[in-house]
């Protein structure tokens, strides 16, 4: 019985340490807040995730216990498919592999679609980018698509939406 307990204990310990090594964080200034048990990163913050996504910002707070990083100011995410996300407030959960923005967000997809919205989520496990807020998408030809919510399938480069959809083409026609 003791050997089973120790095996489970050491297995859990090894798995916990392995998951912490999948996140790379660097910045010019690093400090610790012992009261809140977080690490604070300032000036040229760079985070690389296990999925090889890169997150750059001016400021980040990392709570290792929760696996949560909060970002502020000049955030730029480049995912492994070369989609780019810009925002001023966001957080990344290293456990669930979900990146969420708070407030206005701009996305440039790898196929040159520009997306303006807010409160956008990048789910690395499901390989989707989505929002339940009003979103405006502009394609390479200048056509404008307004949606109440959307889902972008990263692997297939496909947009999906249910509900209100308005399309204005580059000639001024709309539907």
Regions found by a protein language model. Name each.
Residues 18-175:
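N-terminal amphipathic/hydrophobic interface segments
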Residues 4-16:
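Sec-dependent N-terminal signal peptides
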